[in-house]
């Protein structure tokens, strides 16, 4: 028993494998009329026209949904009814020319990054500040990706032309004529005339000796040019300062700092006069027997004998 499709009533397949049912994605069945033109499906108009010619008008692409499919561009461009091709050109944008990009580079070099309004007003007059900022972003991305891989030549690969800043030289004027048009140097003063004359004579003598050594053919080809003015040589003496030492003369002595010595108005007090102690001796002579005794004589003290001192020998005991 052959299979019979419940969708198209044809034999040989079922409803799941029927080619006329379309595509089912996430439970939603899509037909050819609901598919609009996209970037990956740019040949839908050709397919619809080919299907219409083969099927004789039986294809669903010839229905009312075929009009937006056959139109050029994206379906989102025709969202507003009655839109013209001018709006599409405005959305697409006008590409930058080389002259505009050259002016943009010059403005970027002069004003720096961020001043898109100044670049738009002074350099790229035909572009708005927003367009200048967008162009700068693309330019910087291109410059950062230059070393990654080899790319096609683009407008962003242009090098800023620095010759636009420099004003052109007037025609027929050469640098040599500019040097000749410079004002002459002021004449030397009377004080310097003698030195300058001596230097001039020495220079002329050197030039004459050089011309005598050079052959005739070189003189005609390379003439000797003598400068018209020489800077004078001034002789001046170096002043001798007084604080400098003369090698031949005597060496001067430096001043010494005199420190004051304090002078006491009163004589210093002798401690031995206030408190006197006897000297200890071991009977060196008979005359010093009296002084050998230990005694402490205080100023203004009593004359009585101390208990700690021995009695001096008397004449009777002797």
Swiss-Prot record:
Residues 50-77 have a biased composition (Low complexity). One of its GO terms (molecular function) is DNA-binding transcription factor activity. GO terms for biological process: negative regulation of DNA-templated transcription; response to ethylene; response to gibberellin; response to sucrose. Residues 116-140 bind DNA. Residues 88-144 form the HTH myb-type domain. Keywords: DNA-binding, Metal-binding, Nucleus, Repressor, Stress response, Transcription, Transcription regulation, Zinc, Zinc-finger. Expressed in all tissues, with the highest level in senescent leaves. Residues 1-20, 50-98, 159-200 are annotated as: Disordered. The keyword Transcription applies. A zinc finger (CCHC-type) spans 3-20. Residues 8-18 have a biased composition (Polar residues). The keyword Cell inner membrane does not apply. Induction: Repressed by sucrose and gibberellic acid (GA). Induced by cold stress in roots and shoots. Induced by salt stress in shoots. Down-regulated by abscisic aci (ABA) in shoots. GO terms for cellular component: nucleus. It comes from the Eukaryota. NCBIfam families: myb_SHAQKYF. Transcription repressor that binds to 5'-TATCCA-3' elements in gene promoters. Contributes to the sugar-repressed transcription of promoters containing SRS or 5'-TATCCA-3' elements. Transcription repressor involved in a cold stress response pathway that confers cold tolerance. Suppresses the DREB1-dependent signaling pathway under prolonged cold stress. DREB1 responds quickly and transiently while MYBS3 responds slowly to cold stress. They may act sequentially and complementarily for adaptation to short- and long-term cold stress. Plants over-expressing MYBS3 show increased tolerance to cold stress. This is Transcription factor MYBS3. It comes from Oryza sativa subsp. japonica. The gene is MYBS3.
